[in-house]
């Protein structure tokens, strides 16, 4: 997992944002007064360096889409001073027919991923032309191969029954 500080000014509070699949540090910009900000992305490797956060007194966690699963798994044993945790359009069961993405759809996404299918995916995700135009200005610069590897890695990790005890507010 990549952990990228978009704002690091030695504040006592931190916004820790776990993005969805395929994103990078360009995906969003948060500039809240008295908060540092760290963006987590690329779940090809789920290793999480908790030492980055040892000096914070309060951490607000946000998980979006696949980031809900990534945050749930990585934060459950970190013992960080989490003040609040907000899950946005995601699940701790990312590849599951009833509570996540149908495994057949997930596999087809891996098998058929290319520039055109990614564009179609992003348009559907955004929901409107206006949202899509905004998203494109801030979209990930990662390669198709990188995105595919991330999906394959997530699929492999989920098959290992990586259940979580992390609690969302």
Annotate each predicted stretch with a short phrase.
Residues 1-48:
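Conserved HGGG/HGGXW glycine-rich cap/lid loop of the alpha/beta-hydrolase fold
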Residues 14, 58-60, 84:
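Structural motif
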Residues 65, 91-92, 127:
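Short, flexible active-site-adjacent loop segments at beta-strand->alpha-helix junctions, enriched
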Residues 76-112, 140, 147-159:
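Flexible "cap/lid" loop of the alpha/beta hydrolase fold
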Residues 165-169:
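Catalytic His-Asp charge-relay segment
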């Amino acid at each position: 997992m990549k952990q990228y500080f978009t704002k690091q000014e030695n504040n006592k509070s931190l916004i820790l944002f776990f993005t969805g699949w395929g994103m990078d540090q360009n995906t969003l910009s948060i500039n809240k007064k008295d908060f540092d900000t760290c963006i987590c992305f690329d779940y090809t490797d789920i290793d999480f360096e908790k030492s980055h956060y040892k000096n914070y007194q309060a951490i607000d966690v946000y998980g979006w889409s696949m980031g809900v699963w990534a945050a749930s798994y990585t934060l459950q044993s970190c013992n960080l001073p989490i003040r609040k945790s907000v899950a946005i359009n995601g699940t701790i069961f990312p590849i599951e027919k009833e509570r996540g993405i149908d495994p057949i759809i997930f596999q087809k996404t891996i098998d058929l991923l290319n520039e055109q299918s990614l564009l179609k995916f992003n348009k559907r995700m955004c929901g409107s032309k206006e949202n899509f135009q905004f998203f494109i200005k801030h979209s990930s610069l990662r390669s198709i191969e990188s995105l595919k590897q991330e999906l394959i890695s997530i699929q492999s990790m989920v098959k290992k029954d990586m259940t979580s005890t992390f609690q969302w507010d």
